[in-house]
Amino acid sequence: MKTRDKILYKSLELFNELGEPNVTTLLISDELEISPGNLYYHFKSKTEILTEIFGWFENEMYQLLESPNSGSDIEDQWFFLHLIFENIAKYRFIYKDVVNVLERYEEIKLRFQKIILKKREASLKILSNLQEEGSLQANDGEVEALCEHIVLTATFWLNYKLISQGELTEDVLSQGVYQVISLVAPFLDAGQREQLNELKAAYL
């Protein structure tokens, strides 16, 4: 692996483990056992490192959100949401310290806001399809409210679990998916609710 890539992957690891504000370029170079000058040759500042890693997150998230599953099978939506939560966990430092990070990096703040809007659009597309197919018994106002709650839960789920448990366990992603779908459950038809119960038994 090239030194530049090693710097990025080690930085992501340290950001996730320690939190972005607690990671310096000196720490990154020490962890990689390279000189600060070598790191500086590839990246002039931590901001450059953070911006590139955010670009990874951004590209991966957009790939997921550009093509949400439009079918009416609740299991398909379960796995789609699981992929979203996996992406959030992979770059969890962004979500764990989201207010602090976004306040200090204006460019990233604007890009993250666009991702939030895209999450909402994807949620609306899925719910609207379920609504049109008769699987979701909700009016347009309820669908709009559900979209807000879905994005809110997905965005802050890891923070909630860290605060309540002190650590992230292996089943935290499936729990997050279930919490999101549970928001929709009261509006699902009987068949979809039964399938949701089966998924809960299988994955939680």
Please give the residue ranges for each predicted region.
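N-terminal positioning helix adjacent to the helix-turn-helix/winged-helix DNA-binding module
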Residues: T3-K10, L146
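Helix-turn-helix
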Residues: K6, L14-E48, E52
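Short, basic, alpha-helical segments at the C-terminal edge of helix-turn-helix-like DNA-binding modules
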Residues: G55-M61
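Secondary-structure edge/capping motif, primarily at the C-terminal ends of alpha-helices
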Residues: L65-N69, Y95-L102, L130, G134, ...
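Hydrophobic alpha-helical connector segments
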Residues: E66-F93
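Amphipathic alpha-helical segments used for helix-helix packing
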Residues: I88-L110, K125-N129
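Amphipathic alpha-helical packing segments from all-alpha helical-bundle domains
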Residues: E107-E133, E144-N159, Q175-P186
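C-terminal peripheral helix-coil segments that are non-catalytic and often amphipathic
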Residues: I163-L204
